[in-house]
Amino acid sequence: RVADFYTIAIEHTSSGHPAVYDIPLYFLFGVWNLPTYLLYKFADYDYLNATPAQLWLKTMMLVFVLLAARILMRIARTMGMDADRAKWVAFYFLSAMSVVLPVFVIVQYDIVLVAVMLLGLHAYMKGNQRGFLLWFMLANTLKLFAVFVFIPLVLLKEKRLRRVAGQAVVGLAGLAFCRLLY
């Protein structure tokens, strides 16, 4: 019934908003929420109305925002900043209202994409082509916004059309797989 995922999501939505992202993000949610599911299954735990379960879900956003801050520190170090200055980069990121409001107040899942894109950008800056392509292959499946970062980065570094096409195929393969699956 994997092929019926979106149909099932529409039929059984509890919030009025059915599944709108590609399947990798929901896989991540499933892995993260496995402890609450096990409590629900074996201990009759009402996870939809339980504050600890809601806080557990919000903790996922905290983990990804801290991961993004850590990656920004690494990017700053790659750019030649000393360790103290790199910490300021993370501080400014974590204190920005464009981070605090969406991540901690609204609980938007875009921070997952941001963290994965930053991993890809860091690999790009270090010259790790394989890492860059693999991170962006994942990022492109999380949200299409990543494509608008991925394509210019490929074109910035590579000018030979065959290699551009090859890298585009690799970077967009995950997205194509998700679209073909559903």
Language model features by range: what are they?
Residues F104-V112:
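Short acidic/glycine- and proline-prone juxtamembrane loop motifs at membrane-interface regions
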Residues L172-Y182:
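Transmembrane-lumen/periplasm boundary regions of multi-pass, lipid-linked membrane glycan transferases
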